Amino acid sequence: MKPSDVRSKAFAMPLTSPAFPMGPYRFVDREFLIITYRTDPDRLREIVPEPLQVTEPLVHYEFIRMADSTGFGDYTESGQVIPVEYNGQAGGYTLAMYLDDHPPIAGGRELWGFPKKLASPTLHVNTDHILGTLDYGKVRVATGTMGYKHKELDIDEQTKRLAGPNFLLKIIPHVDGTARVCELVRYYMQDIKMKGAWTGPASLELAPHALAPVADLPVLEIVEARHLVADLTLGLGEVVYDYLAQ
């Protein structure tokens, strides 16, 4: 294969059978359980990279069920998102994500910079409540519950919240182990069709784990819980800050 052919075909690895396809990346009936809790503000400031700024000592703990996604298939995800500001723009910084499907792990890390790791999350209705769990290996590290559809939320407001900016720290090493890419990336959810939004009483339990340290941001108080169902497109990203260029 000629170098020009390599350049024209190069998108993702392996070259002859990429781990994930080109987009657009559309999700149908994507289901969220988002439990917002208050945590230790000092710990937040230690882990959120500047120029992002922590605005409140809050964390959104998310369980997401994605049964129909373009190119990625059927999978579930769980992780922590921290409310932040960038140049006065409010958004969310994704700290870590745990999921059970290789294509979105590879695509998420290589394309956007999502901090994804392999684990075993679940999200389903358990009789009268919605239940989210996260197992890392044989250890249960997160359990979230919310009363099932106790109260409807405003669809327009929840659509607006979901459409806000999201931030990622994309890191790709060079072959010698030094940083080749170290960038702050911004992306948006697009073409959102909110099909339902509810709230109810909620609980969240996090357990310590060396390699899935969700409990490093302890739950001090549950602030809010939301159960959302939406169709949406995961938009591609843009680099807003290059750490290696500074």
UniProtKB/Swiss-Prot annotation:
Pfam families: ADC. The active site is at residue 116. InterPro entries: Acetoacetate_decarboxylase (IPR010451), Acetoacetate_decarboxylase_bac (IPR023653), ADC_dom_sf (IPR023375). Signal peptide: none annotated. It catalyses: acetoacetate + H(+) = acetone + CO2. NCBIfam families: PRK02265.1. Catalyzes the conversion of acetoacetate to acetone and carbon dioxide. This is Acetoacetate decarboxylase. It comes from Burkholderia cenocepacia (strain ATCC BAA-245 / DSM 16553 / LMG 16656 / NCTC 13227 / J2315 / CF5610). The lineage of its organism: Bacteria, Pseudomonadati, Pseudomonadota, Betaproteobacteria, Burkholderiales. The gene is adc.
